[in-house]
Amino acid sequence: MKRIIAPVAALTLAACSSLAFAQGDTLSFFITSVGSGDGANLGGLEGADEHCATLAEAAGVTGKTWRAYLSTHAADGNDAVNARDRIGSGPWFNANGVQVAANVDDLHSDNNMLSKKNSVDENGDQVNGRGDDPNMHDILTGSTLQGMAMDAGASCSNWTSNGEGSAQVGHHDRQGGGANPTSWNSAHGTRGCSQENLESTGGDGLFYCFAW
């Protein structure tokens, strides 16, 4: 029996190593498995980007530039930032090797492959959607349908507030309520910016991460 177990263990280890290599080689899109824990206060774009990189590295992915899919409005002398302009040019693949979009225009069209099945976290696990307990389908974006920045009041003070305000969110499962219920990036605004507010709307402070 021992002679059989050793080769099987070796094959299992090799398979796991191959899977990790494949994921690290292709993974360039995911939903964060956890948020900041402080509502929509992500530490600004810089803090959100760092969170993306930290989760990716924990999943075994290194050597890539990660950016959170988040927009900010013009403030304090700084120009507005559009989510679509900060995520690279594509293509993007999830942790299971599925190409979700070929380029920026494809991502913001009906041709993308974003869905509850394909919009997974950095480990390849599905994120709770409508009908699950708890529902966590509200994904922070602060963006329009085309990935552009919105007016002040749609990004919780440019992702630095956990108090009053609102953040525009999308539905990763492509269903629910709001002005654009099937939109992955611009379904509706939240009731506030605190963790409790986000959870009461149907989210958990999660956001999309893209890499190149």
Q: PLM features: residue spans?
A:
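Cleavable N-terminal signal peptides
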Residues: 9-10, 20
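Secreted/extracellular ectodomain signature
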Residues: 21-212
